[in-house]
């Protein structure tokens, strides 16, 4: 536990000790090494990490200690001993004994350590390198041959191990077991033969494996994609935010010559602490994809997209939008500033409320829920919760850092976790969650059955709850009656910010209801507009199915919405804002190239509503942000929105503030009757795996190598009726198509079958035309 965490506890006992002649007062339980840090005294260490349990493995942090005049007989590891009253500590700075002990440990660590510094990825930012200079001998007394191993060993497609570099600090193994709950990497053998390894025939299967690379102090673990690519002093580092989910991770982006070479987890004690998932760490090659769009495109008379100048493209887009009935599909990946730009552009330049960010399965009930039931939970509430309820939410796959925070409390105090799902997943198994087993579409009864929640309880709801009529109404009722805190956690990083920016058909920026005159006056005043459209607009699916003549599309994959979305959109005049060629650009009349996250400044809003600002990491990029292009397009239409820069959009949005007026109560939706199935049928359940066929993961072969195998999950009862055993092929089909995959037998609801939603061999909209809560046939392949 860190000093900061200890200090937040009420009535913590404080203890004063002396370190190198200086008094320091710290909370009871503070480790000596942490108390020294408070004085600015740096004790060398390798195994110590403030977020891992003490191990005392490397022995590099030895210091002289005496308590009430009685000295320890030999130097002690300062990373394992808590401060006590009357304690006097002498570090290497004041004690020759401690200094000699540290030099001796360093000499032993270097006996077999290779001279890889000129080529090692850790060179230039290596604690061993630095501390060998500051706390080691100037010459080695060892004259024998150094131990060598085969190098490197791939413990996964993403992580490589150089065993001779390892100092056995056990940071990687402790992280895997204590933080991620994935004990697939371990210390093998004993004594001089001890080394890091993985279990036989089991690769390092973890969504968080990249953190072991980052916290390794000596370059024993390296990332495949970064190995031998650059030196730290070649890189320009920029603090950034992750664009892959709503967790809100702080990040660091390292760029060389205008190209991103690596990304690291940033430090934010309130959000991701010092961790991130492998998707956030390694999924960035889409920025330099071969099909990247760098110039505006216009479809010519022959139906071919041709490069055009910006004035030509703006004129063509304006001509197609100016007098048409228009909708705006924003997508869930945009920054807050860009979402605000789309929101203002729709209302001012196009005079419509036909705008929606939900590029996924959605419902009108969800709009009512989001407008009337605000998120009140935070990460801190999870840290203090007595009970966490997961509803249509798979934390490890849909918001990995939320899983880590829940798991931390489970390890610390066995927090109670309940999950409404069709079966116990890998992550809920690690949390020892109570499964409220239900088929997809039958969640309402399960939600209504939950009792015993308090104001300290936290209910976390995923975006998939919108797929079951009545589920979100039941959640709202549960929150209102129990007093529990609510967290709505969508998958994509931009959705919470887009909601706040008013990129929905029934809300203006700041969660102001469209049908409230005072709310419209608030926004019209800021925007300098005489009036705003007053009727609730169309949702994403309604826009696609409508007779609208034109649609502005910002980074939307039509296969995330419905199987025939592309065909229906192709009949309309499409203006596309895209990073690279896609299904939408294939049917667009005008395509504008937009900047990626590393090429522009902006912000995301995480699931708890915290704004995560970032600056451009690749400043020499010529690509423009969405909001800047929208502002130019509005000028061309003749209805300016006056948002020429990201900063202008941010300042205007922040000046608006949140709505403090009346909020309409949620309209209760009527749940559907639970489906009944025949013997050869099942109700389809699905969600997206963290590592799947998502477009932002394209080109990441090493990352794809650790994606979990696509399987059909069936019950033992169904396996018996089909006469199949584990790993046999099972065919799931309907009138649209079929998916055939190996089966896994789990304690799943007997009427259900589960498939990954968008993984290799199981892209449900493409294969089956549905994603969940539908009846399918199940047979032995």
What does each model-found stretch correspond to?
Residues 2-37, 45-49, 65-72, 86-449, ...:
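N-terminal export/assembly segments and adjacent metallocofactor-ligating motifs
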